[in-house]
């Protein structure tokens, strides 16, 4: 009898984590490495949020909490949804988990049966398909390439829906492309979904506050009230509030679903960290001005990276609307040989040779379901990005 489960054989480790770990190992060994794999802001958690956590510790708020979040945080989340998205929820419709990833996973485990399908536009966050597999469902990837701005069309969505479809995962702005759907584009998708009442919508809004050029962020339940009762609107404090290590995600949706997710959490991790919950409460309720300051920095970095990558031979880099990623196409590099003798057969070979020969760590596109591309996280200092892009330019210039 095999010791490891059949389920494990169907999933793979996160490639973004693998690339980040590889870069750290090389740096620890003395290599000059620039890691652009991690989707993590380089800015520190704001002082008022850290102070709230310290107050919670001093006040002895170090015990178990309610499984799916303290009441104060749930109320703050309700206020956030109404203030920023025009969505009204009660605390009973809100759940808090140990990061956005747990929120999504809880929902999938609570709802999927064998044979249930989940539509996932590609390129996608690396964890979506594997979480569906772990939950017993079937991921259905639909390619949304550069020709559509990395956005799913209504026609593609309609064609992908079957009687077995249970969820549609929607992520805007997107990881890995930074693409964000306009109000009109989202409305067109919602029109399709209104024709299929068996399909639920999982909206991953983690990058909501990271949109550029005065882009108007919208979310499905906000655009189409008719979808409110079958939409799980997911968010968290990791990206916008520079709190990736605090591990707090949250979602709002129908009470029956929220209760089911709470049951899953009660038998897995139980409550999120009590101190982190009080920090998240301050994040959502405290001063918000720094969001605009950070957004300006990310927009400046985006402009720098897009400009420099488009000067690299064989590379085409679209200009994303949000998040802190770019997803350049490297069709012009495939089939060539690097200065170090590496055959660039695909985007994984490109990323491997780039790391080995220049010390720049990126994530290859196949990990996100669409090739030939690679992802760069530009959530790091301008001078680091400038050096990394210069190395990429030199690497591409050396291909023959």
Swiss-Prot record:
Matching SUPFAM superfamilies: PLP-dependent transferases
Reactions mediated catalytically: L-aspartate + 2-oxoglutarate = oxaloacetate + L-glutamate; L-arogenate + 2-oxoglutarate = prephenate + L-glutamate
GO biological process, one term: biosynthetic process
Pfam family, one: Aminotran_1_2
Top-level EC class as recorded in UniProt: transferase
EC numbers for this chain: 2.6.1.1, 2.6.1.79
Gene3D superfamilies associated with the record: Aspartate Aminotransferase, domain 1, Type I PLP-dependent aspartate aminotransferase-like (Major domain)
Modified residues (N6-(pyridoxal phosphate)lysine): 239
InterPro entries: Aminotransferase_I/II_large, AspAT/PAT-like, PyrdxlP-dep_Trfase, PyrdxlP-dep_Trfase_major, PyrdxlP-dep_Trfase_small
GO molecular function annotations of the record: glutamate-prephenate aminotransferase activity; L-aspartate:2-oxoglutarate aminotransferase activity; pyridoxal phosphate binding
Superkingdom to which the source organism belongs: Bacteria
Residues marked Important for prephenate aminotransferase activity (site): 12
Binding site for L-aspartate: 39, 125, 175, 375
Subcellular localization: Cytoplasm
Requisite cofactors: pyridoxal 5'-phosphate
Keyword annotations from UniProtKB, A to Z: Aminotransferase, Cytoplasm, Pyridoxal phosphate, Transferase
PANTHER family named among the record's database cross-references: ASPARTATE AMINOTRANSFERASE
Quaternary structure and partners: Homodimer.
Family per record: Belongs to the class-I pyridoxal-phosphate-dependent aminotransferase family.
Function as written in the Swiss-Prot or TrEMBL entry: Catalyzes the reversible conversion of aspartate and 2-oxoglutarate to glutamate and oxaloacetate. Can also transaminate prephenate in the presence of glutamate.
Name of the molecule in the record: Aspartate/prephenate aminotransferase
């Amino acid at each position: 009898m095999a010791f490891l489960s059949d389920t494990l054989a169907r999933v793979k480790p996160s490639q973004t984590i693998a690339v980040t770990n590889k870069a750290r190992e090389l740096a620890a060994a003395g290599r000059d490495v620039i890691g652009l794999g991690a989707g993590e802001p380089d800015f520190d958690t704001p002082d008022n949020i850290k102070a709230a956590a310290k107050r919670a510790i001093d006040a002895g708020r170090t015990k178990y909490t309610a499984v799916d979040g303290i009441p104060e945080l749930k109320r703050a989340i309700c206020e956030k949804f109404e203030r920023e998205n025009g969505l009204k929820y009660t605390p009973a419709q809100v759940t808090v988990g140990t990061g956005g990833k747990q929120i999504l996973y809880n929902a999938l485990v609570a709802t999927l049966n064998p044979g249930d399908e989940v539509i996932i536009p590609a390129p996608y966050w690396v964890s979506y398909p594997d979480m569906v597999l772990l939950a017993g469902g079937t991921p259905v990837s639909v390619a949304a390439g550069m020709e559509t701005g990395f956005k799913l069309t209504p026609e593609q969505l309609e064609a992908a829906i079957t009687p077995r479809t249970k969820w549609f995962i929607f992520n805007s702005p997107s990881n890995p492309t930074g693409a964000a759907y306009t109000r009109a584009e989202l409305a067109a998708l919602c029109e399709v979904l209104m024709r299929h009442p068996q399909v639920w919508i999982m909206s991953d809004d983690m990058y909501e506050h990271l949109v550029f050029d005065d882009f108007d962020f919208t979310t499905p339940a906000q655009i189409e009230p008719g979808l409110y009762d079958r939409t799980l609107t997911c968010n968290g404090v990791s990206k916008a509030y520079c709190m990736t290590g605090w591990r707090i995600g949250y979602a709002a949706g129908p009470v029956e679903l929220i209760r089911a997710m709470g049951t899953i959490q009660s038998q897995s991790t139980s409550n999120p960290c009590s101190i982190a919950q009080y920090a998240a409460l301050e994040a959502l309720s405290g001063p918000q001005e720094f969001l605009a300051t950070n957004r300006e920095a990310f927009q400046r970095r985006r402009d720098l990276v897009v400009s420099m990558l488009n000067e690299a031979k064989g590379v085409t880099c679209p200009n994303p609307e949000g998040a802190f990623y770019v997803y350049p196409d490297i069709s012009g590099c495939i089939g060539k040989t690097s200065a170090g003798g590496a055959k660039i057969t695909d985007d994984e070979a490109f990323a491997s040779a780039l790391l080995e020969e220049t010390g720049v760590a990126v994530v290859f596109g196949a990990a996100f379901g669409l090739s030939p591309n690679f992802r760069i996280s530009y959530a790091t200092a301008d001078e680091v990005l400038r050096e990394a892009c210069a190395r990429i330019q030199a690497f591409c210039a050396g291909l023959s």
